[in-house]
Amino acid sequence: MLHIADKTFDSHLFTGTGKFASSQLMVESIRASGSQLVTLAMKRVDLRQHNDAILEPLIAAGVTLLPNTSGAKTAEEAIFAAHLAREALGTNWLKLEIHPDARWLLPDPIETLKAAETLVQQGFVVLPYCGADPVLCKRLEEVGCAAVMPLGAPIGSNQGLETRAMLEIIIQQATVPVVVDAGIGVPSHAAQALEMGADAVLVNTAIAVADDPVNMAKAFRLAVEAGLLARQSGPGSRSHFAHATSPLTGFLEASA
């Protein structure tokens, strides 16, 4: 079970809604993933329509919605988007995203921390997308964020856990859930994140652009379950030396 703020989730896999060929394929993939928390960009939701092609099927699927502020370039823009989301969707939950450079989509640490502090004070449950910076993640935790979401690699890059060393420090020192977000490209990346101690992963592009998104979503579900089970099972420690799994000389001595 995963506890974040006032909610509990059975699944440790969070999913996104972008890049799918259709809303039907999006919903089928989310169901196959077992995900219970789904993020969506407010800039893609038509708040004037009651039958929005993205929002309506998500509500029907019964998942918890995590609106995000993707597209915001400053703290002020993110705070404005957060209030729109709360009014439109009736939720205090928010994935805080501030990335001023459209080419790299890297989160702005200064603006993110500034916005997070304000939004927490205004009653939001803030889950900030941030760089894999242990100092920043600790500061975000200290201002009241319900979880931290450090990147594994740039958004949509499918590079995997390129920031592994920093992620390990973040996980070790965190007292709130750590969700590895961005860059996860294949199920094995997700399994590795859970094995190393992450509480969850958020996957979007790797599922949405797959030749078979539904089966890829299922593969990610199984990988996350395997990674979590492996960690809970207590894997053996790494060694620079070989260790025999059976006696090497006993049978020779017995036959002498």
Swiss-Prot record:
Q: Which HAMAP family match?
A: ThiG
In its UniProt entry, the species of origin is given as: Escherichia coli O127:H6 (strain E2348/69 / EPEC)
Database matches in PANTHER family:
THIAZOLE SYNTHASE
Domain of life the protein comes from: Bacteria
| Catalytic class of the enzyme | transferase
Q: Which CDD domains match?
A: ThiG
Top-level taxonomy: Bacteria, Pseudomonadati, Pseudomonadota, Gammaproteobacteria, Enterobacterales
Please state what the protein is called: Thiazole synthase
One GO MF term on file is: thiazole synthase activity
Give me the Gene Ontology terms describing cellular component.
cytoplasm
